[in-house]
Swiss-Prot record:
Biological processes per GO annotation: rRNA 5'-end processing
Protein name per the record: Putative pre-16S rRNA nuclease
Enzyme Commission number(s) of this protein: 3.1.-.-
GO cellular component: cytosol
Alphabetically ordered keywords of this record: Cytoplasm, Hydrolase, Nuclease, Ribosome biogenesis
Species name: Saccharophagus degradans (strain 2-40 / ATCC 43961 / DSM 17024)
Length: 142
């Protein structure tokens, strides 16, 4: 089996969570949360992550409504994914991320998080969950 490295992003207008993982174990590790202004990150930070991890594919969470319809944040997340692809020529896939932030908050709470998400964000935990969910739907082939 060929090992693949994937980088996942949980897009947000104030913060963008990041996680990296590899296909041999289908697990992911959180990376530092990336500050954003109106959904625009410091592109040098994104570039540094891409250079460090050299992912085969980037997964960007798509924050669909519970009924599966798209919203304004979906449009912005797609724009973010398109910019990554356009700037860095890496394949990008959008992936349904419904309820990952809620699950990330629950996991953080179980580990003692005090609920102050502005000072202690869970966006990168959500990115890890996005990547792990992606692997459950796209298991590697031997």
């Amino acid at each position: 089996m060929t090992s693949q490295t994937l980088l996942a992003f949980d897009f947000g207008t104030k913060r963008i969570g990041a996680a990296v993982g590899q296909s041999i174990t289908c697990t992911a590790n959180i990376l530092n949360t990336i500050p954003a202004k109106e959904g625009i990150p410091n592109w040098d930070t994104i570039e540094a992550l891409l250079k460090e991890w050299q992912p085969d594919t980037v997964i960007v969470g798509l924050p669909l409504n519970m009924d599966g319809t798209e919203n304004e944040l979906c449009r912005r997340a797609k724009k973010f994914g398109n910019r990554i692809h356009g700037r860095f020529r890496v394949p990008v896939e959008m992936f349904d991320e419904r309820l990952t932030t809620r699950e990330a908050k629950e996991l953080a709470w179980e580990e003692g998080h005090k609920g102050n998400y502005a000072n202690d964000p869970v966006d990168s935990i959500a990115a890890r969950l996005i990547l792990e969910s992606w692997w459950r739907q796209h298991p590697p082939t031997p």
